[in-house]
Amino acid sequence: MKKKVKWAGLLVASLIVLTACGTGPVTSQSTDAWDRLIYWFASIIQFLSINGQIGIGIILFTILIRTLLLPLFQIQMNSSRKMQELQPQLKKLQAEYPGTDMESRQQLYEATQALYKENGVSMRASMIPLFIQMPILLALFQALTRVEALKVGHFLWLNLGEPDPFFILPILAAVFTFLSSWLTNKSAIEKNMAMTIMTYVMPVMIFFFAVAAASGVALYWTVSNAYQVAQTLVFNNPFKIIAERQAKIDAEKERQAKIRRAQKKAQKKK
C-alpha cells in the first residue's frame, strides 16, 4: 500500500509540473511536446464539431477518450475489487504480526505479498492504468482551457468561453461526480473514512469550479462524470457485486448447515 501511495504521489507531482510549466495559449506554432499533444486533441475536437458546433465536438471527443481508456479503467477497477475482497484476510495477517519491530514488519510484508500473489493481485499493475489515464485526461482538459478556438461559439444556451449563466452544468457536474464516487464506494467491504468524506466534498468542489469555469470545461466535466456513472453501472455495478457477495455467503452458510446436519445424522446412527 505504501508503494501505491508513493507512485500515486509521484504521478500527482508530475502532473502538477506539467500543468505549472504550461499555462499559456497553445497554437499550431507551439513546439513543446506537451503543447503539441494538447493542440492535437484540440484539432480532433474541432474535426468532430458537427456544423462547427464545438460543444458537440467536446461531447464526442470526451466519450471517445473515455471509451478508449475503458480497458485500462477495468484493469484498475478489477484490481481494486480484488483488494477489497482480500481485506478480511489482510486484517487476519495484521493480527498475526502485530509487532512494530523491523522483523515483524518484514514478516507481515512477506505474508501480504504472498497473499497478493496467490490471488493474482499486483500493486504495480493497478497503478499502470492510472499513469496512462491521468496525462491523457489532463491534456484534454488543457485543450479546453489553453486553445482559443475551443473557447468561442455557442452550444444550446451556453457561450463556451463564459460560465454557465443558469448553473445547469455546474449542478449536473456535481451530481454526476457524487454518483460516480458513491457507486464506486457502495460495494466496498470496509468503508474508508477518507473516501467517504471525498464522496461528499468533491461534488461541492466541482460545483464551485464549474461555476467559475468556462462552459466548455463544465461541459467536459459533466459528460466525463456522466460517462463514469454509466460505465460503473454497466461494468462494475455495485448492487450486482453486493448481491453476488451475499449469494456466496448464503451458499457457504447452507454448505456448513448441510455438514452439521450430516454430522448429526451420523451421530444418531452410532
UniProtKB/Swiss-Prot annotation:
A lipid is attached at residue 21 (N-palmitoyl cysteine). InterPro entries: YidC/ALB3/OXA1/COX18, YidC/Oxa/ALB_C, YidC/YidC1/YidC2_Firmicutes, YidC_ALB_C. It is a multi-pass membrane protein. PROSITE patterns: PROKAR_LIPOPROTEIN. It holds the Pfam family 60KD_IMP. CDD domains: 5TM_YidC_Alb3 (cd20070). It is found in: Cell membrane. GO terms for molecular function: membrane insertase activity. One of its GO terms (biological process) is protein insertion into membrane. Residues 1-20 form the signal peptide. GO terms for cellular component: plasma membrane. Keywords: Cell membrane, Chaperone, Lipoprotein, Membrane, Palmitate, Protein transport, Signal, Transmembrane, Transmembrane helix, Transport. A lipid is attached at residue 21 (S-diacylglycerol cysteine). The chain crosses the membrane at residues 44-64, 125-145, 163-183, 201-221. NCBIfam families: yidC_oxa1_cterm. Required for the insertion and/or proper folding and/or complex formation of integral membrane proteins into the membrane. Involved in integration of membrane proteins that insert both dependently and independently of the Sec translocase complex, as well as at least some lipoproteins. PANTHER family: CYTOCHROME C OXIDASE ASSEMBLY PROTEIN COX18, MITOCHONDRIAL, OXA1. Belongs to the OXA1/ALB3/YidC family. Type 2 subfamily. This is Membrane protein insertase YidC.
